[in-house]
């Protein structure tokens, strides 16, 4: 039986309104709910809590010491028997997709870029199912690391200061 579990990641980004010497932070709210799943995410905690995205200036420069925020996604399928196929899909092919790694926020000049935390050489494609039932993703017996690093990115040269949000649909499929 194929089970598809839709989830939604919410991201919030802040832009520095004046100078890089002024600082402010904004939380990144993320939540996932799984029902009747044979696999559990982050030890049944799902993904919740706040994650702070790096601050960027209106000229598009990241002014934080860390250039990305890691969103942990550890999928544990040890309690559910055999898992023949395990896929995760971030986003879709909607107009919110800028390219294979970048998603728009509520400001069309500001996007969020995604990459795999575990292996940066693995291609990340929004709207494409990624088979993570492979040794490269393995953390332990039937435990897989699908964590992503999220970076704010200015699409054009400058962006107006303010707070912007984005919602990224995520689907976990297991057979």
Curated annotation (Swiss-Prot):
Keywords associated with the record: Disulfide bond, Fimbrium, Plasmid, Signal
InterPro entries xrefs: Adhesion_dom_fimbrial_sf
Major location category of this protein: other
GO CC, alphabetical: pilus
Biological process annotations from GO: cell adhesion
Required for stability and transport (site feature) positions: 174
Cellular localization per UniProt: Fimbrium
Keyword Signal annotated: yes
Disulphide linkage map: 39-77
Superkingdom to which the source organism belongs: Bacteria
Keyword Disulfide bond: yes
Signal peptide segment: 1-20
Job description of the protein: Involved in the biosynthesis of K99 fimbriae.
Name the UniProt record assigns to this protein: Protein FanH
Organism this protein belongs to: Escherichia coli
């Amino acid at each position: 039986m194929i089970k598809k579990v839709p989830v939604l990641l919410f991201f919030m980004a802040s832009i520095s309104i004046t100078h890089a010497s002024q600082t402010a932070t904004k939380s990144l709210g993320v939540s996932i709910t799984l029902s009747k799943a044979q696999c559990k995410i982050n030890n049944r905690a799902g993904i919740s809590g706040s994650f702070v995205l790096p601050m960027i200036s209106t000229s598009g420069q990241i002014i934080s010491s860390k250039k990305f925020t890691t969103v942990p996604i550890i999928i544990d399928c040890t309690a559910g028997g055999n898992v023949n196929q395990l896929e995760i899909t971030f986003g879709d092919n909607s107009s919110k997709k800028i390219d294979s790694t970048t998603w728009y926020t509520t400001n069309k000049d500001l996007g969020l870029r995604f990459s795999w935390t575990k292996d940066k050489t693995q291609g990340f494609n929004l709207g494409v199912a990624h088979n993570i039932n492979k040794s490269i993703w393995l953390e332990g017996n039937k435990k897989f690391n699908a964590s992503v690093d999220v970076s704010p990115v200015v699409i054009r040269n400058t962006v107006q200061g303010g707070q912007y949000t984005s919602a990224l649909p995520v689907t976990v499929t297991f057979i």
